[in-house]
């Protein structure tokens, strides 16, 4: 899930880019990219659970990644780009495990789901130039999004599983 995908979503209050899961304190982007810190690039989401549930956020997450690739994501290769869900308590862990199992059972993907579900550890905020990157450099972000293969991957796996808006419009009354 990128910042671009998490905002604006009703109920999401704040999204911060950063690093987590490793053994180096206060890692820099360069250190994380070296693949030697054990950290993954991640985002930390603050949300209002009266408006959006953890499960709903997970459903959004699954539709932004390739959960079958344990070597990174699209154009970003290396363990620091592997997908993971970091949980903060047993309830989140169970919801995440159920969500992953549901995705696996859906057979949307031909390969095994390899996204890890692991306890949250200290989160280190990324440098300022990595915050809101999609807003600061929209052209670069959009070129990467399409050029990396992510756009086509997401479209090919999820468009058929989304509501056909034109068909839905036919069922609505004029007031709706």
Spans of features found by a protein language model:
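Flexible coil/turn and secondary-structure edge motifs
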Residues: 1-4, 8-176
């Amino acid at each position: 899930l990128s910042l671009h995908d998490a905002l604006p979503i009703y109920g999401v209050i704040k999204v911060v880019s950063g690093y987590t899961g490793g053994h180096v304190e206060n890692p820099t982007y360069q250190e994380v990219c070296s693949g030697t810190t054990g950290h993954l690039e991640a985002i930390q989401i603050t949300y209002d659970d009266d408006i959006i549930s953890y499960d709903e956020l997970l459903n959004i997450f699954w539709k932004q990644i390739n959960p079958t690739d344990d070597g990174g994501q699209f154009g970003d290769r290396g363990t620091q780009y592997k997908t993971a869900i970091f949980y903060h308590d047993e309830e989140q862990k169970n919801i995440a495990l159920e969500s992953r199992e549901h995705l696996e059972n859906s057979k949307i993907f031909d390969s095994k789901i390899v996204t890890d579900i692991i306890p949250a550890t200290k989160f280190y905020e990324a440098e300022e130039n990595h915050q809101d990157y999609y807003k600061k450099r929209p052209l670069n972000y959009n070129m990467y999004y399409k050029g990396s293969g992510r756009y086509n991957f997401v479209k090919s796996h999820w468009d058929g599983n989304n509501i056909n808006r034109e068909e839905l419009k036919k069922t609505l009354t004029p007031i709706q």
